[in-house]
Amino acid sequence: MRNTTKLVVHVVDAQYLMPRDGQGSASPFVEVDFLNQLSKTRTVPKSLNPVWNQKLYFDYDQSVINQHNQHIEVSVYHERRPIPGRSFLGRVKISLCNIVYKDDQVYQRFTLEKKWLLSSVKGEIGLKFYISSSEEDQTFPLPSKPYTSPTQASASGTEEDTADSETEDSLKSFASAEEEDLADSVSECVEGKKSEEVKEPVQKLHRQEVFARPAPMQSIRLRSRENPHEAQKPMSRGANQLHPQNPNHLQSYGDTDLDDFKVKDMNLDLGERWPNPNAGERFTGTYDLVEQMFYLYVRVVKAKELPPGSITGGCDPYVEVKLGNYKGRTKIFDRKTTIPEWNQVFAFTKERIQSSVLEVFVKDKETLGRDDILGKVVFDLNEIPTRVPPNSPLAPQWYRLEDWRGEGKVVRGEIMLAVWMGTQADEAFPEAWHADSASVHGEGVFNIRSKVYVSPKLWYLRVNVIEAQDMIPSDRNRLPDVFVKASVGMQTLKTSICSIKTTNPLWKEDLVFVVAEPFEEQLVISVEDRVHTSKDEVIGKITLPMNVFEKRLDHRPVHSRWFNLDKYGTGVLEPDARRKEHKFSSRIHLRICLEGGYHVMDESTMYISDTRPTARQLWKQPVGMLEIGILGANGLVPMKLKDGRGSTNAYCVAKYGQKWVRTRTILDTLSPRWNEQYTWEVYDPCTVITLGVFDNSHLGSAQSGTADSRDARIGKVRIRLSTLEAHKIYTHSFPLLVLQPHGLKKTGDLQISVRFTTLSLANIIYNYGHPLLPKMHYLFPFTVNQVDGLRYQAMNIVSTRLGRAEPPLRKEVVEYMLDVDSHLWSMRRSKANFFRIMSLLSGYFLVGKWLEDVCNWRYPVTSVLVNVLFFILVMYPELILPTMFLYMFFIGLWNFRSRPRHPPHMDMKLSWAEAVGPDELDEEFDTFPTSRSQELVRLRYDRLRSVAGRIQTVVGDIAAQGERIQSLLSWRDPRATSLFILFCLAASVVLYAMPFKAIALASGLYYLRHPKFRSKLPSLPSNFFKRLPSSTDSLL
């Protein structure tokens, strides 16, 4: 069977190549090597900036390709003439993990690299590469000759395209009927000096026949299930408050065991209980980080030949599975169905099995009276087989129905069932109906299942507003004050008002938005006139769809475009009869693109879990695998009342990168056991995984709350991957802490197991020497205000999209996991940060105190040794740096014994949560803007003024010291400056005449002199410095 999937390498152009022909030029061609398949372009004679615009095709079979270990090698050569031969000009290696489909292709420029150490290489090459399986791209002529030499290969037949269809289509998608001429002119300008496109067949070195059809590339997309016209609701900037009904708050920690707030080692042997066929390979089994839990699975497939009901004569069949006191029912079919198919799975935990037999009843739903029993099937639990993956699924079988009275009489009808004993690793586990959730009905059944979510793919939309023409206001007697307003969904940004009142304003300002795939919103551009401080008049408006904007991966310039403005705001792609009424229209000049070289941050940089740019073409290879086993929780606090007692319906959410996971909800227990394991690819070890525990309030019952109820937060755990040792399993119990308006509260413990497996140590070391974020964040950074605003909008989009999944990951959960309120003011956080700085500086303070003790000869032996060491270092200064680094090396080895054994956790002392006052907590949980009384706000403002006054004094003292240094040579104090410059002259003569070692030795011995030779008065330099003037005298 012939493989129809092709890898297309579109060689566009090159720039600034190295001359090779001895006349300051070169005749370059490109050769591409992909898995021993060679193909080359034509030769462009006498050009250092050649343009090929040629496509090369290669067979692509994903079933035999390892994307992480194989590359495409693109080499540039100079063709020597008249003597056949070639000279190397540079090459580029492209990893297969960066390959995308044709719809996502983007033009990229690569810097040419050397092949050998002494090679002389410079220049760049422009390429597009993608995978295509369409018939249009497969129609190319077959080669008539095998690959021989560059001269012969360049003479092979090619097929020419009429135009660059991508650029043409993207431009014409903007243009309306009146703008076709403009689109054509812009298309010609974009093509520039590009030659006609050439499609070149593959010249194979080794021919292979592939009989297996290649598997398609896997991509995960979050599909929209919501009405696209529904408006997004912005996030509330206020802090979320949690008020459980039975709070046991920790007001004082004097009598509390502080060990309850520390990480505890569980010491569980998790991997030994699971069958592991790949024990000798690099990766272990799929479920080797959790405890094994056995379940009795019953799969009800379908039934046939069912008898009619005894009352109505018809049949509305359904199946009831009974095991002890647990009962589960399938959906009901109507009478029109002769062979009902349910295909439902029921799961009963082995720990709660209370019977030795399993009964499966087939019943007929009756409108009046009891349901009629058509028959049953009975299974002895001792005879049920056990099945654990990777064993194949158990095939269902047909069973004859027996009389439900137990007489052994066979009745009419058969039912197809599969019954087996399995574990949570079974494929049927996520979608099965669980016996412990029998009290959940309606939509609540879907809200308790475990699910995996994917964050939407976020882009930065950059709108560069350049200028506008013919801005005619409604009042022709005045010149307009013009500004531009751009909107995308709920995001709205404005440019400044043009500094000059004119009908042809100029701005050159950038407006940046956050948009998500699939693109649902449109960009609305309106030009408005500031008539009055409270009145703006729209001059023109235009609506543009997102999918027509150009995507760029670097800082290359994007082509700008003029757009006609419409008074009614009609888009350029939407013909409207009203547009024909106006023969004259204003115009605006815009440059719009989707930025793929940035990472769109939806979480704080301190807790970032993903640093990859938006464009998949720029992703690096993964450096490791992160495996998390969510075992369970212990000692959870009751979050609601049920039947007069406390109850908690807990589930756990984990977020790392773009992948979110949610465990199933365990009902009515304070010690839930999930035992679910998940895996993530790691692209940067300096990232953080976040796990949160919540109480489910959407179970479809009156006791569980209404649709407007919020899932209460129970606690959160963060783990930084760089703090974990590779290939080691960490099994710990982490305390869950929640800060509430009444104080800090421990809500339980989360038990998890973590393993970080490295794929390549060299790649991890490589990451430590490179920036955390993509290079565009440093070459063209956003301002601080832009970063905060864009992060807020990104969190809004992520919470909205995940809230539309089924079951939804609710807004309050996403906000808590992304720390939406981390930027709000808090006196507690300010104190915590201040003491963090003091703790950081405490080491320097200890060194200063130790040095003071040495100078005062408080410990004579130490002082003598320091003097001797100082003398040696002065006489042999080349030993200073080696001694310092060797000292740090031995300190690091010494500290290895006391290295941290546990991952970091939420520290209540570091967070300053153990001594915070109730008023400060109430202030932290206040909304933004405030919702407290005026008197309370006044008291807090006075307190903030007192704190700011102390900070103001410290900052003023620091500024005064710096100004005194500046005044040394400023002649603000003529006598002080005269003395200082005379001292500098004398010092220069002395330093020139005397050896440096003698001066350093004399200065050091003077500093370390005995207290007998010291005075308690300040030194002469200190007295002189404190007398210098500063700008404090000039302050009001």
Curated annotation (Swiss-Prot):
Ca(2+) 2 binds at D364, E366, D372. It is found in: Cell membrane. PROSITE patterns: C2. GO terms for molecular function: glycosyltransferase activity; metal ion binding. Its cofactor is Ca(2+). Residues 158-168 have a biased composition (Acidic residues). It is a multi-pass membrane protein. Ca(2+) 1 binds at D316, D364, E366. One of its GO terms (cellular component) is plasma membrane. Residues 137-204, 225-246 are annotated as: Disordered. InterPro entries: C2_dom, C2_domain_sf, C2B_MCTP_PRT_plant, C2C_MCTP_PRT_plant, C2D_MCTP_PRT_plant, MCTP_C, QUIRKY-like. Residues 190-204 have a biased composition (Basic and acidic residues). SUPFAM superfamilies: C2 domain (Calcium/lipid-binding domain, CaLB). The keyword Chloroplast does not apply. The chain crosses the membrane at residues 871-891, 979-999. Residues 1-110, 277-399, 440-563, 607-734 form the C2 domain. Expressed in the vascular tissues of roots and rosette leaves. Accumulates in roots meristems. Observed in flowers. Disulfide bonds: none annotated. Keywords: Calcium, Cell membrane, Glycosyltransferase, Membrane, Metal-binding, Repeat, Transferase, Transmembrane, Transmembrane helix. May function as a signaling molecule by regulating the trafficking of other regulators. Belongs to the MCTP family. This is Multiple C2 domain and transmembrane region protein 2. It comes from Arabidopsis thaliana (Mouse-ear cress). The gene is MCTP2.
